């Protein structure tokens, strides 16, 4: 997402907030956890999706979703996307829906909103008669 300048200050502040949230969502569980994945020779969920999809076709859904859990101190830890990358795009020119669980966020563990994102992608795939990859 490239930064833009708006004439209206309110639009600029909203755009800046969207840009900040987008950048935050792209980092998953943070730079340290991404480095740990790379040190093990593994790709992140986002990197796997980008490799799979035809260039420039992936549209992410639910990028800003966060979990609602409060037990075990989770009310103090929030990551945008809630540990799963979901969306659609093309593979070899064919529409597909994808989800990829992000180990950098809570070890890729399943929360209520995490599961809801996967179910939404499955429903969209069925509705549109397209395959799902997860």
Would you name each region that the model predicts?
Residues 1-134:
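Terminal-region recognition feature
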